[in-house]
Amino acid sequence: MRLHTAPLLLITALTAAAQQPAPVSASAQFQAIQSRLLASHAASDWLANLAAAQDQQALLNDDPAALLEVARAEVHIRDVHLNGDIAAIRELQQFVRMGQSTDFIEKTPDFATLRNRPEYADLQRDMAANRAPIALAATALVLPDANLLAEDIDVDTARHRFLITSVREHKIVAVSVTNSASAPAAITDFAPAPDPWPIVAIKIDRTRSRVWATESAMQGLSFSPKSDWGRTAVLCYDLRTGKLLRRVEGPHGSAFGDMLLLPNGDVIVSDGDGGGLYRLASNPASPDHLDRIDHGEFISPQTPALAPDGHRLFVPDYERGLAILDLTTQKVSWLAPQGRFALNGIDGLYCNRNQLIAVQNGTSPERVILFTLDAPLATIVSEKIIERATPTLGDPTHGVLIGRDFYYIANSGWDILDAHGNINSGAKPSQPRIMRATVPGPQPSTGSSPRQ
């Protein structure tokens, strides 16, 4: 589940976290840095602002928006640091190399001096290229219910159907895999949420005939009663009947938005609001206890993906990028963006041997992309965009890999909502569209290759 609060100072102001004790977790560090950015910006203390922006850049592993913060500060200190404009240009060039585009550089007065530099035309040209449509997927099916706010999807292979979660209608629906794309598909209700909350993540345990899902009364959003905001739970249904078998509530203030099913049937859920990763044993005889398996390294973890060795998780953090979590040692490391790969804003993530398929609704532009890793799965060597800037791509969320075909929700509907989950004035929900892209088989990855 994507981060629905604005992440960086470029977009919003943060609450006064600076009065809190010295930060330990990544979330606390992030809040403290944001407070420094806000205070130094208000005081026009650009040297302090640059220091805070660089700390944020380091914490967020070269998140593209963090690069813009650094560039802005560098422009403002050009009278103190004569190379400020040149340094800012370098940050913006890296932003563009990462496949990003923004009108912020053109519209804000902060970058006015850069617009007179010879490099600016190249930046504009390259950002325009980054906005060019790419369409390697085709429509697989269209759901007739435009009010679903479809979030996650998995496949029940035995019954040839997709199960799809609905945020707005608080349920899981079923739709046949064999539906034609030429007409809206027939959908049926699989199971309701036990509470008046959105159902968010879903994973099907075909071996044990179970459906795992999460429900979440998301803070500040109109989809749930205000009295329930901050509550969340893991759910388990019978795959055949849709009967609710288990409900395990998470810590208050959490939002279980994404999920991974392990081969032994255990479930990993991520808390995009509180920054935690939790493991729930599948054995019904086990206590309904959620074990936290991280140590505060994450700000907003999203959909984990299991590496082929079965011992490591790829964990996308909406803010910090792509992490690798060792399930045995719980040690966390981060994939390097290498100045050219944007790894932030990933909502759905799926592993296919040495490939990672990512649904990025937090990049600019939003996109569905395939990353190829080296043999040890420690370094990204190339990327291939599946879909970007097309009429069918609204706000993509999650997908499922069936053989070499990747099916994904292309236009969930989040992009027409305001900060409280209400439909923007004049906007009209569209029918959810499931796209299908054939993913190339894993390729040898012994060397580096350019962006594709």
What does each model-found stretch correspond to?
Residues 176-181, 238-243, 281-286, 326-330, ...:
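Short loop/turn segments that connect beta-strands within beta-propeller blades
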Residues 73-75, 101-127:
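TPR/TPR-like alpha-solenoid helical repeat scaffolds
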Residues 39-51, 84:
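Helix-turn-helix repeat elements of alpha-solenoid scaffolds
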Residues 144-160, 167, 193-208, 214-219, ...:
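Beta-rich, blade/repeat-based domains predominating
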Residues 131-135, 139-173, 430-432:
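Beta-strand-rich domains and repeat architectures in extracellular enzymes and scaffolds
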Residues 137-144, 182-192, 243-249, 287-296, ...:
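A short beta-strand motif characteristic of beta-propeller blades
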Residues 213-230, 411-431:
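Short, conserved, GDST-rich strand-edge loop motifs in beta-rich repeat architectures
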Residues 167, 216-218, 272-274, 282, ...:
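Short loop/turn segments immediately following the C-termini of beta-strands
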